[in-house]
Swiss-Prot record:
Phosphorylated in a cell cycle-dependent manner with phosphorylation increasing at the entry in S phase and dephosphorylation occurring at mitosis. The N-terminus is blocked. Its main location: nucleus. The keyword Transcription does not apply. It is found in: Nucleus. It comes from the Eukaryota. Binds to single-stranded sequences participating in DNA replication in addition to those mediating transcriptional repression (URS1) and activation (CAR1). Stimulates the activity of a cognate strand exchange protein (SEP1). It cooperates with T-AG and DNA topoisomerase I to unwind template DNA containing the simian virus 40 origin of DNA replication. Residues 69-157 bind DNA. Gene3D superfamilies: Nucleic acid-binding proteins (2.40.50.140), Winged helix-like DNA-binding domain superfamily/Winged helix DNA-binding domain (1.10.10.10). This is Replication factor A protein 2. InterPro entries: NA-bd_OB-fold (IPR012340), NA-bd_OB_tRNA (IPR004365), RFA2-like (IPR040260), Rfa2/RPA32 (IPR014646), RPA_C (IPR014892), WH-like_DNA-bd_sf (IPR036388), WH_DNA-bd_sf (IPR036390). Belongs to the replication factor A protein 2 family. It comes from Saccharomyces cerevisiae (strain ATCC 204508 / S288c) (Baker's yeast). Residues 1-13, 29-38 have a biased composition (Polar residues). Residues 1-38 are annotated as: Disordered.
Length: 273
């Protein structure tokens, strides 16, 4: 991966998020459930400054609820505990420590081997480099007064375009939450309150578009599973739903953009919220 300049030379984003937490006409339990099951692009500053208005309630930042979040940043430090690692990640607005558990049976032995020259020996630690960019997905929690990302999925970033794209998503969603932009899905979600998706004119099934079928299939497959060790591959979706892989890939991209699923091991495997 190419070497980049310090993150704060590029980053000026200080806000973001998908949902406006103010009540709107017609809002209710279904809208609350939608927020809980939606991935929100944020900055680390938003995570650190978020507050709980009520005990055990959702975290709120910039007029929006934060449940599952994603953010990008630079790895500043790696602490290897063989069975898990702690990554210190900074994005120009703040710094946070994220723990990732290893699934590799050889990590206990490899943890004492520093022959790689990087100061850490486990297989999970060698997936990351100090100074490299990563994207983090997970549930926002707090333990002992400290913000944590639970069930964290951490993906190395190979292209700086992904960092810029994330910043644009944060700006867009912050604008929606603050009322400066309209929610793009608002007109679709207000269609009798039945669907968040625009109807697929090419759909020939009984009332379900490929987008909806893929989301329902992914949710069913991911129920009770851990995103660190399980994902739904595109070929499985294609074979199970009798859809061509191009259609599945395009739908997965749309669902990712909408915050309902996210890529895990690579861009061909997804986990549903």
């Amino acid at each position: 991966m190419a070497t980049y300049q310090p993150y704060n030379e590029y980053s000026s984003v200080t806000g973001g998020g998908f949902e406006n937490s103010e009540s709107r006409p017609g809002s209710g339990e279904s809208e609350t459930n939608t927020r809980v099951n939606t991935l929100t692009p944020v900055t680390i500053k938003q995570i650190l400054e978020s507050k709980q208005d009520i005990q055990d309630g959702p975290f709120v930042s910039h007029n929006q609820e934060l449940h599952h979040v994603c953010f990008v940043g630079v790895v500043r430090n790696i602490t290897d505990h063989t069975a898990n690692i702690f990554l210190t990640i900074e994005d120009g607005t703040g710094q946070i420590e994220v723990r990732k558990w290893s699934e590799d049976a050889n990590d206990l032995a490899a943890g004492n081997d520093d022959s790689s020259g990087k100061g850490y020996g486990s297989q999970v630690a060698q997936q990351f480099e100090i100074g490299g960019y990563v994207k983090v997905f997970g549930a926002l929690k707090e333990f002992g007064g400290k913000k944590n990302i639970q069930y964290a999925v951490i993906k190395p970033i190979d292209s700086f375009n992904e960092v810029l794209t994330h910043h644009l998503e944060v700006i867009k969603c912050h604008s929606i939450a603050s009322g400066m932009m309209k929610q793009p899905l608002e007109s679709a979600s207000n269609n009798n309150g039945q669907s968040l998706f625009v109807k697929d004119d090419n759909d020939t099934s009984s009332g379900s578009s490929p987008l909806q079928r893929i989301l329902e299939f992914c949710k069913k497959q991911c129920e009770g599973k851990d995103a660190n060790s399980f994902a739904v591959p595109i070929p499985l979706i294609s074979q199970s739903l009798n859809l061509d892989e191009t259609t599945v890939r395009n739908c997965c991209t749309t669902l990712t953009d909408q915050g309902f699923i996210y890529p895990t091991f690579d861009d061909n495997n997804f986990f549903a919220l």
